Amino acid sequence: MAASPRVSLPVGCIGAGRMAQGILEGILHKGEITPQNVMVSAPTDRNLEKLKARGCCTSHDNRSVVSNCRVVFLATKPHIIPSVLQEIYPKVTADHLIISMAAGVTLETLEKNLPPGSKVIRMMPNLPCVLQEGAIVFSRGRCAGEVEADVFESLVRTCGLCVEVPQSCIDIHTGVSGSGVAYVYTFAEALADGAVKMGMPSALARQIVAQTLLGAGKMLLQSEEHPASLRADVCTPGGTTIFGLHELEKGGLRAAVMNAVEAATTRAMDMGRK
């Protein structure tokens, strides 16, 4: 792979689901790579139509993607990855950078099922990447160096936060951020339902809850303070917030959330052992 981190070479993606489309949209958002330089494969046209309309090249042949692109994202379901790797093996060269976003599939598994010396990156995004507000972590395989890391980061930076981590943190990221989006939606639904119970119209409740979560998240990011400190700022002695928090404590909210992260992380680890 060329020594420059600036990517103008064709980018491929095997798989065209919602996460793949989100990552590709982020890549195209920068404008450095045109849709004509993106090639995507999927078994059927159902998920390819939107990308085709965007101007991307599409195919039903995974090997064609690898033959035509030097950077290739693997965006299939985890249980499909072994067959995909077997299929593309003859086409992968030392010039390729293979990037997997499949939950639970380790770097060791990827490297074992690709030609020796293959440059591999394992990434884990989350759903807000489709709006360029995601959180991505990644780890490099043994043969992927700083150049490959720079290429990867230059591609996905517009999708949101992007951080290189030890591989041991990727399954944890799956549990806290990949799955965490669903926890937040569940909490948002409960907040809105509480407002509806007290008499607020449902549409208004959802709008206010969404803005509340957005504002709280921005404050957490921008202030760099511990969540407990920000929470304490909202709690006046004898006020409404401390009464509400007391009910959350009685319901075991924090323990339940911690258990959810543990369960999802453990599941991701189990998937990697299969």
Swiss-Prot record:
SUPFAM superfamilies according to UniProt: 6-phosphogluconate dehydrogenase C-terminal domain-like, NAD(P)-binding Rossmann-fold domains
Single GO biological process annotation from the record: L-proline biosynthetic process
Catalysed reactions listed for this entry: L-proline + NADP(+) = (S)-1-pyrroline-5-carboxylate + NADPH + 2 H(+); L-proline + NAD(+) = (S)-1-pyrroline-5-carboxylate + NADH + 2 H(+)
Principal location listed in the UniProt entry: cytoplasm
Family annotation (InterPro entries): 6-PGluconate_DH-like_C_sf, NAD(P)-bd_dom_sf, P5C_Rdtase_cat_N, P5CR-like_CS, P5CR_dimer, Pyrroline-COOH_reductase
Subcellular location as annotated: Cytoplasm
Enzyme Commission (EC) number: 1.5.1.2
GO MF annotations, alphabetized: pyrroline-5-carboxylate reductase activity
Listed Gene3D superfamilies: NAD(P)-binding Rossmann-like Domain, ProC C-terminal domain-like
Keywords: Amino-acid biosynthesis, Cytoplasm, NADP, Oxidoreductase, Proline biosynthesis
A Pfam family the protein falls into: F420_oxidored
Main EC class the enzyme belongs to: oxidoreductase
Pathway: Amino-acid biosynthesis; L-proline biosynthesis; L-proline from L-glutamate 5-semialdehyde: step 1/1
Any one annotated GO CC term: cytosol
Protein family: Belongs to the pyrroline-5-carboxylate reductase family.
Family matches, as HAMAP family: P5C_reductase (MF_01925)
NCBIfam families: proC (TIGR00112)
Its biological purpose: Oxidoreductase that catalyzes the last step in proline biosynthesis, which corresponds to the reduction of pyrroline-5-carboxylate (P5C) to L-proline using NAD(P)H. Proline is synthesized from either glutamate or ornithine; both are converted to P5C, and then to proline via pyrroline-5-carboxylate reductases (PYCRs). PYCR3 is exclusively linked to the biosynthesis of proline from ornithine.
Alphabetical list of PANTHER family matching this protein: PYRROLINE-5-CARBOXYLATE REDUCTASE, PYRROLINE-5-CARBOXYLATE REDUCTASE 3
Subunit and partners: Homodecamer; composed of 5 homodimers.
Annotated protein name in UniProt: Pyrroline-5-carboxylate reductase 3
Origin organism lineage: Eukaryota, Metazoa, Chordata, Craniata, Vertebrata
Gene: pycr3
